[in-house]
């Protein structure tokens, strides 16, 4: 089944899970698409089975809190940031609920975490205005970049380069093997006083970069030239909430939730809005991602919703 405007318009909520007492701040699909794991402001980690459509387990990180949860490549392991006490990143085995390693270094809250798609490298960005490069096998930071403002960061799909968004006005591209030489490309964007960048994502084909903001718009940027291709708006975000925007796995569409529980979908090429879907969420949709392997996506406020298409194309 191929994703088309019609298929996207046909998506409906198939299941809603009420496992959390506070907002879900992040979730991540496993590379196989078989499970999704969420972190929440209620300090819980919930693992869901996507095929059976049910929660499998709940773990807690009461002391440190949990945010920015990411699967690693090893089965049943995740990394996540703390959102209270300290700013150490933790590497957890879900199998026995034990920490494998800690990654200390950041002196302020971690605001972005990106796992390399190909190996054990990951990068983190913090309000301490640094990006750190790590290897899961060592607690020591493998690389450090001091930046001129609040950063966001992400690996490209090949794991060869990473992008840093700095101070909501600049995108810098680094080669992983020679990042200490500085960025090989810098794209200056129009600065917007009304909001700040909250995340940066590459499309799966590596050609596009999506800049999310805590305002009422998103920017789609050509990953090679740095030109803004489209600015997407027309969704509600009056309270400056961090809303997650995502590409579909075929790199053809972009989706974002809104504060009124609706999901807006645009075509990347034409820039046209193709669908507005009502998730009937009780609060702002803080997290939204398409499954990397199956024709389903998930959205979350304090509830988690699984969506399925209702037509067979």
Curated annotation (Swiss-Prot):
GO molecular function: chromatin binding
One GO CC annotation: Set1C/COMPASS complex
GO biological process: DNA-templated transcription termination; lncRNA catabolic process; negative regulation of DNA-templated transcription, elongation; negative regulation of lncRNA transcription; nuclear RNA surveillance; positive regulation of transcription elongation by RNA polymerase II; RNA polymerase II promoter clearance
WD repeats: 19-58, 105-144, 146-184, 192-231, 236-276, 280-313
Highest taxon of the lineage: Eukaryota
Compartmental location: Nucleus; Chromosome; Cytoplasm
One Pfam family of this chain: WD40
Keyword Flavoprotein: no
CDD domains, sorted: WD40 (cd00200)
InterPro entries, per the entry: G-protein_beta_WD-40_rep (IPR020472), Swd2/WDR82 (IPR037867), WD40/YVTN_repeat-like_dom_sf (IPR015943), WD40_repeat_dom_sf (IPR036322), WD40_rpt (IPR001680)
Keyword field: Chromosome, Cytoplasm, Nucleus, Repeat, Transcription, Transcription regulation, Transcription termination, WD repeat
Signal peptide coordinates: none
Family: Belongs to the WD repeat SWD2 family.
Function: Regulatory component of the SET1/COMPASS complex implicated in the tethering of this complex to transcriptional start sites of active genes. Facilitates histone H3 'Lys-4' methylation (H3K4me) via recruitment of the SETD1A or SETD1B to the 'Ser-5' phosphorylated C-terminal domain (CTD) of RNA polymerase II large subunit (POLR2A). Component of the PNUTS-PP1 protein phosphatase complex, a protein phosphatase 1 (PP1) complex that promotes RNA polymerase II transcription pause-release, allowing transcription elongation.
SUBUNIT field: Component of the SET1/COMPASS complex. Component of the PNUTS-PP1 phosphatase complex.
Protein name in UniProt: WD repeat-containing protein 82-A
Protein's organism: Xenopus laevis
Taxonomic classification: Eukaryota, Metazoa, Chordata, Craniata, Vertebrata
């Amino acid at each position: 089944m191929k994703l088309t405007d019609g298929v996207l318009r046909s998506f409906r909520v198939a299941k809603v899970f009420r496992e959390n007492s506070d907002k879900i701040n992040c979730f991540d699909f496993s590379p196989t698409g078989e499970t999704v794991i969420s972190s929440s402001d209620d300090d819980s980690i919930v693992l869901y089975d996507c095929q059976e459509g049910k929660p499998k387990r709940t773990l807690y990180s009461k002391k440190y809190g949990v945010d920015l949860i990411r699967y690693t490549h090893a089965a049943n392991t995740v990394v996540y940031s703390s959102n209270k006490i300290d700013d150490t990143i933790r590497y957890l085995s879900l199998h026995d609920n034990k920490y494998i390693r800690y990654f200390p270094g950041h002196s302020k809250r971690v605001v972005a975490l990106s796992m390399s798609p190909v190996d054990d490298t990951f990068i983190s960005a913090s309000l301490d205005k640094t990006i750190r490069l790590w290897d899961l096998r060592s607690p020591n930071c493998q690389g450090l970049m001091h930046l001129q403002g609040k950063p966001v960061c992400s690996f490209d799909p090949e794991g060869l380069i990473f992008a840093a968004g700095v101070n909501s006005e600049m995108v810098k591209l680094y080669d992983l093997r020679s990042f200490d030489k500085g960025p090989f490309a810098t794209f200056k964007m129009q600065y917007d006083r009304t909001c700040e960048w909250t995340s940066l994502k590459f499309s799966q084909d590596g050609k596009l970069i999506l800049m999310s903001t805590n305002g009422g718009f998103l920017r789609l940027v050509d990953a090679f030239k740095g030109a803004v291709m489209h600015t997407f708006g027309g969704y509600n975000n009056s309270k400056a909430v961090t809303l997650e925007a995502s590409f579909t796995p075929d790199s053809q569409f972009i989706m974002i939730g809104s504060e009124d529980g609706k999901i807006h979908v645009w075509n990347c090429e034409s820039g046209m809005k193709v669908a507005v879907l009502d998730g009937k969420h009780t609060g702002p949709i803080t997290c939204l991602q398409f499954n990397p392997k199956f024709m389903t996506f998930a959205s979350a406020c304090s509830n988690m919703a699984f969506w399925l298409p209702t037509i067979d194309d």
